[in-house]
Amino acid sequence: MHPVLCKAQNGLVAVLQEFRAYWISLLVLIVLAQQLPHLSAVLQAAGFGGALIVAAVISGWLATELFLRGPRIKSKGKAVLITGCDTGFGHRLAMRLAIREDFQVFAGCLQPDSDGAQRLRLIVTDDKLHVIPLDVTNAEQIQDALRYVKANLNGNQLWSVIANAGVNIFLEFEWIPIKDIEFLFDVNVMGVVRVSKTFLPLLRNSRGRLVLVASYAGRIASSSIVPYSMTKAAVIAMADGLRREMAKWGLHVATVEPFYYRTAINFNESQQDMMSRFRRDVPLQIQQEYGDYPAQAFQWILSCLRRVSRANVDEVVDQMVNAVTDREPKRHYRCDGFLNWLLSSALFVLPSVAQDIAVSFFEPNFRANEKSGLLLEIGAPSVTKIDDG
């Protein structure tokens, strides 16, 4: 077969495989609609074509997530490296892969003497889990980690690297000092780059998995997380491009893209902490021009986080495990629950103007006053700006 036709065939098979539950659901619903008069009447009343597609999407999603995970690879002879294991997703993933999935785990911790690192050592006491110091901004420490992994594989292959370490700062773009934006990129982007480039030769040899933890924020940016969204968009772009480059080696690259979850990265600051950071880092003139908006914005951020953040962080860990162990892996693993998945999927496909309108409904209603030049809440009395002197 011609190489182009061969690639087209493989691509079609991959699409059919990844979305098999949706095709099956659509076919089953069409057959049932012909056999069951009541179902046919309901679909016709709702608009047959549209209702059929919606029902297929819902049932396909449920089937994919709950029943059709497909075969998994065996963990025997395989090791994994995880960054950011001090707390959160990385900490729980390290325990899951070592204890339940029986992988050899190298758990990279920013602080190898932290409570989280000590807990890992206590829970997994044999040679199945190694806690190693790993600051993803430190190139020398990453090289040390590579040497340690090579020396302690004990006949295993490095099957997967999960680049999980990440940081976030909830501040609007104008308020964040350049040094903090550089730090976000150093951890979230360059940290992923450093770790990936260092361990790619081992992953190519094992024909394994490179798993990059991104975020839904990498697909649509909202207020107060613009630099964070920029970093996660870069990670998604890296995963898509690198996956295409590594396909010839049999190495798969995937992203895990969580929604908001109740972890330290989202709940590490109170409203008072945010205001203190704002007063410390933002020039006085800009503080005055923004008026009461920052206090309301911080209250809005925390209120939104409490309302939409999902409590079960094991949903994310489950998807991380799937990315490592699925025999037919996805390209992108979403962690959001059905309702959030449906809403965010709809938002992703809207044009930018519609996205702007949709997002604006959930933000504090402030506008700049033409006379004073100050940012005022809509409906608040106008203030005349008085120049000093």
Would you name each region that the model predicts?
Residues 114, 134-147, 178:
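The beta1-alpha1 cofactor-binding region of Rossmann-like NAD(H)/NADP(H)-dependent oxidoreductases
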Residues 249-305:
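C-terminal beta-strand-loop-alpha-helix "lid" module of Rossmann-like NAD(P)-dependent dehydrogenases
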Residues 61-107:
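Canonical Rossmann dinucleotide-binding motif of NAD(H)/NADP(H)-dependent dehydrogenases/reductases
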Residues 196, 231-234:
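Active-site helix of classical SDR
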Residues 215:
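Residue(s) in the substrate-gating loop at a strand-loop-helix junction
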Residues 164-169:
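Conserved NAD(P)H cofactor-binding loop of Rossmann-fold oxidoreductase domains
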Residues 144-148, 171-175, 179-186:
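Active-site Tyr-X3-Lys motif and surrounding loop/helix of classical short-chain dehydrogenase/reductase
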